[in-house]
């Protein structure tokens, strides 16, 4: 959640081909839960850029003018490929799903300081080496929505690293069972109960669960929205 200030504008996650610190790149998805009027995200360049142009914009403070400003909508998902310069603007609350990687390069931080007058560490040279300088276009996903009597399932994002779906439940929903890899569940609205064989667990907003790759089905009951991610 970031309602008072923008988050680390200019964060860059490494692309796969240029991984250099024994880490994978970090593709991710932002699912907007709520936002203030006029809020949005920065994502990718408006047009093809060169390293020299970006470096000059960082020096003279005009870097924001090179980036796409995208007004957000509640309930919409935004896919951010690794290597894309990006940041969440203030007043935006998202559920963030990321490819597993600990590497982030901070390119710009609004010249902010902490209470001791210190600025956060930047990683400009590393970011310049791995960022995608091409013009960014927001990926468009084909709408895949299944409507049942007691729930609605909508695919939010699908890539080679993960698949995310929103389950809006008003009663009962049987969730997919996977045997090839684990999955995760995050409750972003409401509350309910999960059932797996003889086990049950109550949940509410903010709770998250890892589901092992046992192939055993899980049933969710309640009035809620769950984000299911399969790796």
Range-by-range predicted roles:
Residues 58-105:
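Loop-centered beta-sheet repeat module
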Residues 81-83, 91, 170-172, 180, ...:
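Tight coil/turn sites that cap or link beta-strands
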Residues 14, 23-25, 35-38, 84-103, ...:
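Ligand-binding loop in jelly-roll beta-barrel domains
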Residues 67-79, 197-215:
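Short acidic-glycine-tyrosine-enriched beta hairpin
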Residues 105-176:
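C-terminal amphipathic alpha-helical segment
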Residues 25-50, 54, 169-197:
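Glycine- and acidic-residue-biased ligand/ion/polar-headgroup-sensing regions
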Residues 2-13:
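Single conserved hydrophobic/aromatic residue that forms the stacking wall/gate
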């Amino acid at each position: 959640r970031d309602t008072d200030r923008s988050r680390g504008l200019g964060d860059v996650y490494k692309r796969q081909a240029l991984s250099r610190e024994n880490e994978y790149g970090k593709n991710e998805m932002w699912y907007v839960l709520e936002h203030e009027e006029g809020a949005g995200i920065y994502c990718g360049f408006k047009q093809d850029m060169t390293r020299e142009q970006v470096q000059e914009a960082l020096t003279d403070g005009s870097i924001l003018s090179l980036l796409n400003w995208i007004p957000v909508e509640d309930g919409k998902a935004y896919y951010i490929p690794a290597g894309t310069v990006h940041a969440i603007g203030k007043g935006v609350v998202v559920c963030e799903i990321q490819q597993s990687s600990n590497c982030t390069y901070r390119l710009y931080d609004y010249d902010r300081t902490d209470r001791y007058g210190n600025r956060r560490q930047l990683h400009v040279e590393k970011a310049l080496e791995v960022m995608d300088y091409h013009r960014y276009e927001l990926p468009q996903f084909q709408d895949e929505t299944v409507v049942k009597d007691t729930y609605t399932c909508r695919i939010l994002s699908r890539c080679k690293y993960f698949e995310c779906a929103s389950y809006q439940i008003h009663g009962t929903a049987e969730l997919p069972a996977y045997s090839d890899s684990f999955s995760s569940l995050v409750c972003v609205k409401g509350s309910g109960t999960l059932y797996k064989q003889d086990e049950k667990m109550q949940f509410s907003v903010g709770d998250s669960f890892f589901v092992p790759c046992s192939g055993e089905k899980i049933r969710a009951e309640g009035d809620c929205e769950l984000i299911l991610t399969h790796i």
